[in-house]
């Protein structure tokens, strides 16, 4: 109320985080909260009762209503049917998605200058890893989007190399993966996470037990799944002309397998045109100019210990500086 609305002269409205962002009807309403998302738990009938009992002044309700309606009027089209001249997934949207993927993908390692691959030297390329052929675009929670289509890494490579033989193995059979890597002129591994590993929608009993996930947190390991790390360690040395594409939204430790492969690209969640951008980068059409938004430690022991089962958290005076 004081800083946001009075000192900063903010004329919009305040809404809560999704699901349990509000924990007290009276405190939230009197503190300036105006909209509870995404299900009504503490507002609604409870808020009506709080007003009737005099615990929340009607002025708070009037202020919230004016701010919400004012915002709606400011951004509402006169004719909602004409709000979008083109459908989602139009040419402009596709071009923007491709631009974001091209500019976001980050080169982490390039031993022996493996990348870019030389197209004229590649008659056979092996693409190995479960995520190579899956549409991994991010979380399945409140941030989930539904693109018209998704270009996977495998599809992007096949489209980029129409005259080469593209061998795909999901990595579950290490002997098949080794054979594919050994006979190929180049190898692309795809490994990492999806919404089951680090999405906010994940409940504890649905999380991967290897990572110790809870609500998307990886409590027990910042590395890859055990089978993927083992795949890179065993199959990587079968071909020195190799690159790893990492999929995920946060730090992925590489210490146990990085020396087994040539190049490493961090693709994050590259979106609907991610496979196209990855293929362009692998073959030098586009420079991987993205920057890491987080630190990749060499090993997990370099990080400070975290006590996950604590009931209180204490920050010293210099926290945040």
Task: Give the label of every model feature segment.
Residues 1-9, 158, 232-240:
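Surface-exposed amphipathic alpha-helices with a cationic face
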Residues 184:
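An anion/phosphate-binding loop that grips the pyrophosphate of nucleotide cofactors and donors
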